[in-house]
């Protein structure tokens, strides 16, 4: 445990404590891993291989930490309930997970959801992606924003904020729009229903975003209790994106209903060049302009290396 006491000499100069894999894994303590290989498989992303060792090394200590925060939050709610003579509705604990396209946010969110839902203290854990709050394709086309899809301007932010405000106010059966990656559009008249969960995990590119022009404006981050940023070097992110694009060309894009069916007939070299251009002109640009600048606002940063393995964990003091 001596290593933990001397985490990094430079830590006192930053708002974060930095842990390597071994140091972070020690913080799991005696928490058992109930997840099996069979349970893990449906949680993984399309292009990800992630082992149970990664879950026990990285995600179990994280789930343990979050549970401490949740318990503290519940104690605070109990105090408020006493003060208000019992007239205080249950307030869900909101966790946000941000990061670039292809970094593995969705997988991290699903694993965390599974661990938190199966913790010794039974809790209802819902997961919502901000993709459902993108403007419909028709509106993006009218506004000439297709090349900015995923940028903050392409989201109906006010609708997302109303959704989060309803969740935080304890409202029942709150509707969240559903996005289809097949049709590249919002599915009309279909919704996920969020009914007063104990925990809501909100996953998306720009959930840590704040503005600079309106000081009184509300942001998604105003409703978040604990924020996570999944990080990796850009060359690694681009490589993962191209690899995923190639797999999609041989699978999802071959569906006649796919918005991207025109990519299905590309040669491998053409697919690599197309994916590289999309990254450079859209995803990489969004990363540099909008996503990376929000990283330091997170409560916790998971820094990935090769094979989607987390190499460093940075925890806000």
Swiss-Prot record:
Query: Principal localization?
Result: cytoplasm
Q: Does the UniProt entry include the keyword Chaperone?
A: no
Q: Name one GO cellular component term.
A: cytoplasm
Q: Where does ATP bind?
A: 99-106
Pathway(s) per entry: Cofactor biosynthesis; coenzyme A biosynthesis; CoA from (R)-pantothenate: step 1/5
Q: Which Pfam families does the annotation name?
A: PRK
EC identifiers of the protein: 2.7.1.33
Annotated catalysed reactions? (R)-pantothenate + ATP = (R)-4'-phosphopantothenate + ADP + H(+)
Please give the biological process terms from Gene Ontology that the record holds: coenzyme A biosynthetic process
Where in or outside the cell is it found? Cytoplasm
Key words of the record:
ATP-binding, Coenzyme A biosynthesis, Cytoplasm, Kinase, Nucleotide-binding, Transferase
Q: Name one GO molecular function term.
A: pantothenate kinase activity
Task: State the similarity comment.
Answer: Belongs to the prokaryotic pantothenate kinase family.
Q: Which HAMAP family match?
A: Pantothen_kinase_1 (MF_00215)
**Mind telling me what this protein is named?**
Pantothenate kinase
Which gene produces this protein?
coaA
């Amino acid at each position: 445990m001596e290593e933990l006491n001397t985490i990094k000499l430079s830590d006192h100069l930053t708002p974060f404590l930095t842990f390597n894999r071994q140091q972070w894994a020690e913080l799991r303590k005696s928490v058992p891993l109930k997840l099996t290989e069979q349970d893990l498989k449906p949680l993984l992303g399309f292009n990800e291989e992630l082992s149970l060792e990664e879950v026990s090394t990285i995600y179990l200590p994280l789930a343990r930490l979050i549970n401490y925060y949740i318990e503290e939050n519940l104690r605070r709610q109990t105090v408020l309930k006493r003060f208000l003579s019992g007239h205080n509705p249950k307030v869900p604990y909101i966790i946000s997970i941000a990061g670039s396209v292809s970094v593995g946010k969705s997988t991290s969110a699903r694993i965390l959801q599974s661990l938190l839902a199966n913790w010794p203290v039974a809790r209802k854990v819902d997961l919502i992606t901000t993709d459902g709050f993108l403007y419909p394709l028709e509106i993006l086309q009218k506004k000439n924003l297709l090349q900015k899809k995923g940028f903050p301007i392409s989201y109906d932010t006010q609708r997302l904020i109303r959704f989060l405000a309803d969740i935080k106010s304890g409202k029942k059966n709150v509707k969240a729009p559903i996005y289809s990656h097949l049709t590249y559009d919002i599915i009309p008249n279909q919704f996920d229903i969020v009914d007063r969960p104990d925990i809501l995990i909100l996953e998306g590119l720009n959930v840590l975003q704040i503005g600079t022009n309106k000081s009184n404006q509300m942001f998604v981050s105003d409703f978040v209790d604990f924020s996570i940023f999944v990080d990796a070097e850009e060359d690694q992110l681009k490589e993962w994106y191209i690899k995923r694009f190639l797999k999609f060309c041989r699978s999802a894009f071959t569906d006649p209903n796919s918005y991207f069916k025109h990519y299905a007939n590309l040669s491998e070299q053409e697919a690599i060049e197309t994916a590289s251009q999309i990254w450079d002109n859209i995803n990489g640009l969004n990363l540099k302009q909008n996503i990376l600048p929000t990283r330091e606002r997170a409560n916790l940063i998971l820094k990935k290396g090769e094979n989607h393995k987390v190499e460093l964990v940075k925890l806000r003091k």
